[in-house]
A protein has these predicted regions:
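Short hydrophobic alpha-helices and adjacent helix-cap/hinge residues
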Residues: 1-330
Length: 330
């Protein structure tokens, strides 16, 4: 039995009690969520994170105290909420998305921060030069990068070889996408594909981006993972509705897209990353520093192919792609 499990067992049986009139002080973990308290996306991040933390012996109210703040999808609130959490002097801060990570890192340079997950470019900037050995107080896990998106686009080209104009739906406020489609041109320049940059920040301007997509006569659409676009159910529904009406194949690095009706998706599993982030939090609570914990790139990817969507589009998915799929939707 590990030390954490041993302490938890003693606490549960009453063999360890705070002295009379004195409350036992538990380590404090602060969590900043950019979404609302009941947002669907938290089921992919906060829930698996907390479940993994509990398996490691950190039960809220018993062996750890957890405080949470929610920005309700308003990024302008993140800096104030981050400062509010830092004022509580937690042992560790946990957050996700590039915007939230930037806000928390801007609020403290001393309290350890675990990010699970965020974009590669932002984590490099926050951690300080080296992913392998962070020099700042930030460590965590990469979800998105230009290289990951280029792999997904290559898969889309394999599935739709006649596509010559591919739209890239990007959030101009996402630092990891400021130079798209330059990385895709570099990685896939020999494919004969022209990329069309389509910008949207959320529900308010997604329709304008889709109108541009129609005017530009794109043959296919790729949606990189972004908390305001790919991970936003309302935006996702409008994009998929557009695709059905225009008969445009869609791929994404956000796995839910394929399950909701896109042709395919390829990317890392957010719940797996969140669970691994819990392991980093546990190690910091036990004395590790962010510098001891390298920022991890995704090592495993899930590929989903939606044959139902392919049939509706009149497409035949190559057998080579079907056999590589981890999940096939009939």
């Amino acid at each position: 039995m590990g030390r954490r499990q041993f302490l938890l067992a003693l606490t549960a049986t009453g063999l360890i009690r705070p002295s009379q009139g004195q409350q036992q002080k538990l380590p404090l973990l602060a969590i900043l969520s950019p979404a609302s308290r009941n947002a669907q996306v938290l089921g992919f991040v906060n829930r698996p994170f907390k479940e993994a933390l509990a398996k490691l012996g950190y039960e809220p109210g018993q062996t750890i105290e957890i405080v949470e703040r929610f920005a309700d999808n308003d990024e302008s609130r993140l800096p104030a909420l981050a400062a509010e959490l830092v004022a509580l002097q937690p042992r560790v801060l946990f957050t996700n998305t590039s915007a939230a990570a930037t806000a928390v890192a801007g609020a403290t340079r001393t309290i350890p921060i675990v990010v699970g997950p965020a974009g590669e470019r932002v984590l490099i900037e926050l951690a300080g030069v080296s992913l392998a050995r962070p020099t700042a107080n930030v460590t965590g896990f990469v979800l998105t990068s230009a290289a990951i998106d280029s792999k997904g686009i290559a898969m889309l080209i394999e599935a739709v070889p006649v596509a010559r104009r591919i739209g890239l739906l990007v959030n101009p406020r996402n630092p990891g996408m400021t130079d798209y489609p330059a990385p895709q041109n570099a990685a896939l320049g020999g494919s004969g594909v022209t990329f069309v940059r389509l910008e949207a920040t959320g529900v308010s301007d997604i329709d304008a981006a889709l109108t541009k997509a129609s005017a530009q006569r794109i043959d296919a659409l790729f949606v990189p993972d972004d908390s305001h676009l790919a991970a936003n159910p309302a935006v996702r529904e409008r994009v998929l509705r557009f695709a059905r009406g225009a008969r445009v194949p869609i791929a994404s690095s956000h796995l839910t897209y394929a399950r909701d009706g896109a042709l395919l998706a390829m990317g890392p599993s957010i719940p797996v990353i969140a669970a691994r982030a819990a392991g980093y939090v546990a190690k910091i609570l036990e004395g590790a520093r962010p510098a001891d914990l390298p920022i991890e790139l995704p090592s495993t990817f899930t590929t989903i192919v939606n044959l139902k969507a392919a049939k509706a589009l009149g497409l035949t998915i190559p057998q080579s792609l079907r056999t590589r799929a981890d999940e096939v939707i009939e």
